Amino acid sequence: MEPGAAELYDQALLGILQHVGNVQDFLRVLFGFLYRKTDFYRLLRHPSDRMGFPPGAAQALVLQVFKTFDHMARQDDEKRRQELEEKIRRKEEEEAKTVSAAAAEKEPVPVPVQEIEIDSTTELGGRQEVEKVQPPGPVKEMAHGSLEAEAPGAVAGAAEVPREPPVLPRIQEQFQKNPDSYNGAVRENYTWSQDYTDLEVRVPVPKHVVKGKQVSVALSSSSIRVAMLEENGERVLMEGKLTHKINTESSLWSLEPGKCVLVNLSKVGEYWWNAILEGEEPIDIDKINKERSMATVDEEEQAVLDRLTFDYHQKLQGKPQSHELKVHEMLKKGWDAEGSPFRGQRFDPAMFNISPGAVQF
């Protein structure tokens, strides 16, 4: 499975998890499905067995998958720890810079130096000392000018505060990491995601909104309106014109008490939306996952997938695949037929080399 492909099924799995309410029952559902619908629990005891796993192989497979994601979880823990340490280090550095800048502002300005020039002359037989004192005014002005030139820099240094990261993610890579915005986006008052046939919109509500009668949802083929009922009227949470048509008959909504209004919109056509509402910032649909979910596969496509799965197991065990078995069955019917030159001989499938393209299913 390609990296990120498992996220395709998040919406379906989240629905199961919300229904059963806990991880233990969720795992029971998953393994119960494997028990009822697959050969996961069937053991290969004889060489003639065509389905199942060797003893212990299924358990080893589960353990291997568990260890894979356990390793990823430990890596995530380490990454979070490093990010926290880096955040603390940066905060300490910023605080140190702020303290230094504040201390620089409080340093006393040095007293202007007075320059005294002594001129000695011999006049009338005596020595006369003339003291010329340079007026302190210009010096003071220069000193103040120097201070005024430096002060803005010091204030700017003290005012340098790290910018807060934006509250909402802005790039599609961030949206893809969140199941609620997978193939969609996070907006100010709602979050939306989509697959090949449906869209899911989550509109947050206050914690005290726990009953369906406390909200109002109006859906038409081209618009949506979600409001919360209050004592003095309605408070609109989301309203606008849809960018594409929806099928209102198969669209529905529900309330997750104290969390959000969950609206499932059924697309009229099988194409990807770049926005829910007109005027909304569009997403880049070239950066979303356009693979179809298994939930959207019809019966005919499902039969093909089942056959491919069967062929995969057969190939691993060195046994005939579905196209070979079909030809073997036809050959075996005519092997002992009246007039057949092979009548009475043992039928050996190994005598035939059958290419997959030679068989029509």
Swiss-Prot record:
GO terms for molecular function: unfolded protein binding. Residues 87-106 are annotated as: Disordered. The keyword Ribonucleoprotein does not apply. Pfam families: CS, Nudc_N. The modification Phosphoserine is found at S146, S340, S355. Keywords: Phosphoprotein. InterPro entries: CS_dom, HSP20-like_chaperone, NudC_fam, NudC_N_dom, p23_NUDCD3. GO terms for biological process: cilium assembly; protein folding; protein localization to pericentriolar material. SUPFAM superfamilies: HSP20-like chaperones. Residues 185-277 form the CS domain. This is NudC domain-containing protein 3.
